Structures are given as C-alpha cells and as structure tokens.
Design a protein with these regions (language model features):
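Basic, alpha-helical nucleic-acid-binding regions used in initiation and control of genome expression
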Residues: 2-3, 19, 70-77, 285-287
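A short linear hydrophobic-aromatic micro-motif
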Residues: 250-254
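Short amphipathic alpha-helix segments
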Residues: 232-245
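C-terminal structured domain segments
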Residues: 257-263, 267-294
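Helix-rich interaction surfaces within compact, conserved domain-sized segments
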Residues: 279-309, 314-315
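Charged, alpha-helical interface segments at or near domain boundaries
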Residues: 28-223
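Non-Sec secretion/translocation targeting segments of pathogen effectors
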Residues: 325-349
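N-terminal alpha-helical "arm" segments
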Residues: 1-36
Length: 349
C-alpha cells in the first residue's frame, strides 16, 4: 500500500471507529508546513468545534510500514484514540487577543535555510543562519507543551509590529521555557544514576567508560530549558550570552547540537573552529534526526565586543583588528618627534 492509498483508507474508514457523536464530523486532510518538517495532516472536526488536533499521517504511515503484521483496523483504532483523547481545549477568543497571550510567548530556533518557505509567511529574526520564531504556549501537561506558531496572519490579527512581538517574546520566554545549563558530565551522570538499576553488566561497564572519557574531554556545557525540548533558543535570551561569558571568564564557541539544545565550549585556545565544525557535521550525520538539525556551522561569542557570529567571522575580525593595530603602531613610529623649540629672548636692563 502506497502513501496515497493509506491516506484514502484512513479518511474513508476513520468514523467507523469513533463514537456516535462523531457521525456528522467533517474528515479532511491538508498539507502542513511546520518548522523543520512538512506532512499530510488529518483533521476530524465535530460540529461546533473551532479547533481540532492535526494528526501526522506521514508519521503513522512510516510506523505502519515498519510493522508488517499491523492491520489498517489497528491503525484506524490508534487514530480514533488520538482524536478522542486529545481534543484541544482552548479559548479561541483568548488566543486572538494579544493582551491575553503576551505573557505566554516564547521563542524557538531553527535553520533559516531548511525553513525558507515557512519563514516567508511568519515574523522572524535572523541570527546568522539561524531563525528565531515566535509561539504561544497554549497548554502544558504530562505529554508536553501545546503551542501555536505565530504567522503573519495572526500577527496582523494582533495589530502589533514584528519588533513589538520580538520584544515581548524575549521578556516572557525565560518564564515560559525556563533556562537550564549543565555540563555534559553532569547529564551523563544523571542518566547513569537514573538507569543504573536497569542496566546489564555490559551496559553498566560501557556507561562507566563513557563517564571516564567525558572527564578527559574539554568542558562542554549544555544550554537548554528545563523540559529539554525546543531549548536551543535559550542561548538568545536577553543577556544570556553575557552571563555565560562571566561564568566562564572567557569567550566561547557555540555548537548547534539540535533544536533542543546548544553546546557551549570556552574559547581557551585548546580547540579550533575547524575541529569543532567537523564534530558538528559528524554528529548531525549520524546522531541527529533531520527534523531536529540546526546547521553544520560553529558560532562564537565575543565577550568584549558582545558579538554573536560565526566562528569564521570572529577569526576574520581578529585579523582585521590586528592589522589595524599594526598599521596604527607603524604610523606612530614613522611620525617625526615634535620637540618644543624655545625662543631666545634678549633681555635688557
């Protein structure tokens, strides 16, 4: 069964697995463009409902293909459970009122290149090749955070400028998505403590080796939020990079680990940008899902000039500064000494 046949099968049969109050529900599909991904979404809207969950059919199709024994009846029952158990309980009027959502705004960071089409229809700010976008936290429970992506039409509804939206989102983000900084070693240790009782002897030995290796590596810090989901934007919180520089007592490199976190490494002369860039490329290619990747580049924060930029650009600026300093010094040496000449006066009594 190909994907189109799968979609039609779900659309034609989903109501057979839903309660009686869904018999007049409207079943539709639409192409969804989200940050970092595009998919075909299924919506089942009961009469009178303003909002309804959009179910990712691409994701369900991949799961269906990966399990040959699964029937379409099982798939439809799964979708029906999602429809029934996950209605969106949202006050639509409140979402459309900017004063009601202003304190629920938060930012996300994504690849500007990978999301070019989506960003054409959404307010955003670029930080090099990273894009900051704006979202409203709709609800939060044990399953995670429900949110709404602010696009141009919603911004127009709010009647504010993109600049005002950015300013307000920067104020509220640290309260909605609380920042968290920890060392790589601490995270591995936390994992070790949580899982140690469930590990086999071989797994336990492997984790202990990883802990040993991490203690010999340069000190990386993980910048994310307390939920550790969509936490890469924390690096752009107001004064965050300045505070990080004070903590480290140094400039630092920033590695785009994924949309969920950034890695920070002090620029103490032990590593160079090229080595770090190779590391990012390898990790992206082997360990990060395509939908969660940011970029293959490495960034740098200059604590003296308070500049966030690509590491290559920082190196260029330093060379330009050194060249200018050498030029100024040379000009100073070539300038002749200007000694004060005293005029002799004849004095007569």
């Amino acid at each position: 069964m190909n994907f189109n046949e799968f979609v039609n099968e779900v659309k034609d049969n989903i109501k057979l697995f839903l309660p009686k109050d869904y018999e007049n529900a409207e079943v539709s599909t639409m192409e969804c463009q989200k940050l970092n991904r595009a998919y075909t979404g299924l919506m089942v809207r009961k009469e009178g409902e303003m909002l309804t969950p959009t179910i990712n059919l691409n994701q369900l199709y991949e799961a269906y293909k990966a399990q040959p024994g699964v029937t379409m009846e099982t798939v439809c029952r799964k979708i029906a459970d999602i429809v029934i158990e996950a209605p969106i309980q949202v006050d639509l009027k409140a979402i459309l009122n900017y004063e009601d959502v202003k304190d629920k705004l938060f930012i996300r960071v994504s690849s500007a290149e990978a999301n070019k089409e989506v960003l054409e229809n959404a307010p955003h700010q670029l930080k090099e090749d990273l894009a900051i976008t704006y979202h409203v936290a709709v609800g939060k429970d044990q399953d995670g955070l429900s949110s709404m992506f602010i696009k141009n039409d919603l911004l127009e509804q709010y009647g504010i400028s993109a600049e005002q939206l950015h300013e307000d989102a920067m104020k509220s983000s640290p309260h909605v998505m609380i920042p968290e900084v920890s060392s790589i070693g601490a995270l591995i240790d936390e994992m070790y403590q949580k899982n140690i009782l469930m590990l086999t002897p071989d797994e336990r030995e492997m984790l202990q080796e990883t802990l040993q290796e991490s203690s010999e590596m340069p000190t990386f810090f993980v910048v994310t939020n307390t939920d550790r989901i969509d936490g890469a934007g924390v690096i752009f919180y107001p004064e965050f990079m300045d505070s990080m520089g004070e903590l480290l007592g140094n400039d630092f490199f920033i590695l785009p680990s994924s949309i969920h976190e950034m890695l920070v490494l002090p620029d103490d002369g032990q590593v160079d940008a090229e080595m770090l860039r190779d590391m990012v490329k390898e990790v992206n290619a082997t360990q990060v899902a395509p939908a969660e990747r940011l970029t293959n580049d490495v960034y740098h924060f200059d604590t003296k000039d308070h500049v966030f930029e690509k590491a290559d650009r920082f190196t260029e600026r330093q060379k330009e500064k050194e060249a200018q300093a050498a030029k100024t010094e040379k000009a100073g040496k070539e300038q002749p000494d200007q000694k004060l000449k005293t005029k002799k006066h004849d004095m007569e009594l």
